């Protein structure tokens, strides 16, 4: 039983479907330092072409707390603050090639946060998908550009999420 689990874990790390060499926020508007864009660069490491790449992440401050986005502009009672974000890139993405994508806007106050991924989903051309939960043991396989953070999801401002 233990050998089977170890074998599965080794198999998962060997068959990484996508690897991110860049996953970070940068200031998108020098007049408003809380207006951020997410810049990503990834390589398809799968032998199959990808249709979509989804990344689920949370912004994290310098002390490891998950932080919420801010709402700018008019008041909208239907908009919720959230600590959890989802981006997806639409392919096709060819095997063994690299791609750069930008996502925005994010309005996050305070010092520039770190976008910290917790799940990746890849959808393949022709059907099928894989879900990867990002862990301390596999973060360098999928996000070698990031260090592991023990994220505290309970501290700080608590919206209804």
Describe every region a protein language model picked out.
Residues 2-4, 14:
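Cleavable N-terminal signal peptides
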Residues 10-16:
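Sec/Tat signal peptide C-region and signal peptidase I cleavage site
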Residues 31-33, 59-71, 77-78:
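Short aromatic-acidic-glycine turn motif
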Residues 32-40:
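Short, solvent-exposed loop/turn segments enriched in Ser/Thr/Gly
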Residues 41-49, 61:
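Asparagine-centered strand-capping/turn motif at beta-strand->loop junctions
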Residues 47-52, 66-68:
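Short acidic/proline- and small/hydrophobic-mixed sequence motifs that coincide with surface turns
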Residues 72-130:
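Short, solvent-exposed, Trp/other aromatic-anchored flexible loops in extracytoplasmic proteins
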Residues 108-161:
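Surface-exposed edge beta-strand/loop patches
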